Design a protein with these regions (language model features):
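M14 metallocarboxypeptidase catalytic domain recognition
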Residues: 1-380
């Protein structure tokens, strides 16, 4: 295979990190040599803002239709917290392996009464940049539409939203500075030179069984023990502390265009299947209404693949009745390099889905038999 001919790249592959080289080769082999991204280096530089000056801006000037570095995201979080004191509270739940703070935004009208809560995390896997872009988009839309959108106002008045824009902060920075396709955390291993753990295989639920690897050099490495990663441990501790309030857990990933719910680790039906299936159906229907983009939905094990130690399964096993994982756009054409031009439509449609899931928490679930009308919704 002649990489120079089949990929038409304007850079030497030898200058790229090994994981990127392998990704390109496999990507090309899997598609018979078709060129989907003719200039990979240019696309990466465009998304990272390489060669351009990106100055800190006020919230009103913040561009939600480009990808942002961790520094920019955290500066934005501080600004959001400063300018919306009546609806936003910002706090840290711990520190990453490399010592960076793990910031969370709490959205919702301040009240003394008990409120249910929704947890949303993005950026568990470093290379999935559309995740942090969505978390920022959600915050922006929730705050800006609070005054005129009756649905959003009701959600903010009756629920709290815990938003973690970048879960895997160390890995996210590494994906900006060194390896665009980096997935894992950045923790060191005592026996191997390979670094990092898959933060979505490190949870204490069927840990390191099917769909996870015990080898530190693999992308799905489960870690030396459950919650070995300080990022995972911090989120797990927070959710345990607030499990009586948190009724929905939503983790944003990419890519595949799917909405998944438990179980990931086995082929079995969850006890509240009817309620969760109905919520998923309503969510993808709302998503489809924006631009006609089709999402598959169902149990992760049968819809995507079997995996163990996932945050979604852990959340469900720890008493959060509605646990979901989104796999956002696309289905492989751009993959992890989703163009910035698609941030707006991707986030707009996903916003509809998350609002629908959240609205469902304010209603009593009808536990009768739920059946999908495939003739009415053939795209699902």
């Amino acid at each position: 295979l002649s990489l120079s001919l089949s990929l038409s790249l304007s850079l030497s592959l030898s200058l790229l990190p090994l994981t990127v080289q392998i990704y390109i080769i496999l990507y090309c082999l899997g598609r018979g040599g078709w060129v989907f991204i003719s200039n990979l280096q240019k696309e990466i530089e465009k998304q990272t803002g390489y060669g351009s000056s990106r100055k800190r801006r006020s919230e009103s000037q913040y561009d939600y239709e480009v990808y942002h570095s961790l520094e920019e995201i955290q500066s934005w979080m501080f600004e959001i917290n400063r300018t919306h004191p009546h609806l936003v509270d910002m706090f840290s739940i711990g520190r990453s392996y490399e010592g960076r703070p793990l910031y969370v935004l709490q959205l919702g009208k301040r009240t003394r009464s008990y409120k249910k809560a929704v947890w949303i995390d993005c950026g568990v896997h470093a290379r999935e940049w559309i995740g942090p872009a969505f978390c920022q988009w959600f915050v922006k839309e929730a705050l800006h539409s609070y005054q005129y959108d009756s649905v959003m106002r009701r959600l903010m008045n009756q629920l709290n939203f815990y938003i973690m824009p970048v879960f895997n902060v160390d890995g996210y920075i590494f994906s900006w500075t060194t390896d665009r396709f980096w997935r894992k955390t950045r923790s060191k291993n005592r026996k191997y030179h390979c670094r990092g753990v898959d933060a979505n295989r490190n949870w204490k639920v069927k840990w390191c069984e099917e769909g996870a690897s015990s080898h530190p050099c693999d992308d799905t490495y489960c870690g030396p023990f459950p919650e070995s990663e300080p990022e995972v441990k911090a989120v797990a501790k927070f959710l345990r502390k607030h499990k009586k309030r948190v009724k929905a857990y939503v983790s944003i990933h990419a890519y595949a265009q799917m909405l998944l719910y438990p179980y990931s680790y086995k082929y079995a039906t969850i006890p509240n299947f009817n309620c969760v299936e109905s919520a998923a159906h309503n969510a993808v229907t709302a998503l489809y209404s924006a631009y006609g983009v089709r999402y598959r939905y169902g149990p992760a094990s049968t819809t995507l693949y079997v995996s163990s130690g996932s945050s979604m399964d852990w959340a469900y096993r720890n008493g959060i009745p509605y646990a979901f994982a989104f796999e956002l756009r696309d289905t492989g054409y751009f993959g992890f390099l989703l163009p910035e031009a698609l941030i707006n439509p991707t986030c707009t449609e996903t916003m509809r889905a998350v609002k629908t899931i959240s609205s469902g928490l304010l209603k009593k679930c009808e536990t009768g038999t739920y059946q999908l009308d495939r003739e009415r919704y053939p795209y699902l």
